[in-house]
Amino acid sequence: MPTHTATSRDITAELAFLSRALKAPALLDAADRLADRARDESWTHQEYLAACLQREVAAREAHGGEGRIRAARFPARKTLEEFDFAHLRGLKREAVAHLGTLDFITGKENVVFLGPPGTGKTHLAIALGMRACQAGHRVAFATASQWVDRLAAAHTAGKLQDELLRLARVPVLVIDEVGYIPFEPEAANLFFQLISGRYERASVIVTSNKPFGRWGEVFGDDTVAAAMIDRLVHHADVLSLKGDSYRLKDRDIGRTPSAATG
């Protein structure tokens, strides 16, 4: 018995050392947690090893997903599961569920959410971006004006093409709030280069409070707007969100007065 106990301690210490050497802490935890179950259920050595490795892989994926979420710089954390479909008109759960499969990333396609402020466009864009991070894809989030500022800084530094190439290697860019701030001609040109450079190469998720017919106002040029829309929607799912603002639904502001109250 003493020999067996000492051997068990030696094996435990060796497993701890090996898991540290492999930088696989979840492997040690899984080996300990699953040992009794493996004995009770008469697992083969291969089954026990596979179960332990599965735990380590799952832990690494979860850790990697968290790191990608932080690197994406989302302004908040949102999920598809918590989205309130009842508040909107015409948006089908099936359409959003299909986007949640992330097939559009594999196909290097785009997603566009159109609708008035407060209808959940940014929520859905973030939720898709977070799911992409959890699935192993790199994602970068910023508003349209922030993306333009970033490209303008690169242009001033003489590094615009380097920056565009670097961004082209990111599988998913989330571009929020297209249309909230009109672009000057130079800014519109930079934004066009961003969209054009990703055409059929990588995915973009865009939100806008303006219908496509008014994008000429945003970019100051109907021709530029048409060319941009053409590249953006050629391979894209375009979803229109219709409804009152989430942010105003529990407040009196924004509500239409009744006849009784004038």
Regions found by a protein language model. Give the residues of each.
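Intrinsically disordered, low-complexity and often Lys/Arg-enriched segments
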Residues: M1-A13, F17, G254-G262
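Solvent-exposed alpha-helical segments within well-ordered globular domains of core cellular machineries
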Residues: A13-R20, D29-D32, A50-A51, G67, ...
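Interdomain "pre-motor" coupling segment immediately N-terminal to P-loop NTPase/helicase cores
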Residues: A16, R20, A24-A76
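AAA+ P-loop ATPase motor domain of ring mechanoenzymes
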Residues: A50-D103, G107-N110, K249-T256
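Conserved P-loop
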Residues: L91-R169, G216-F219
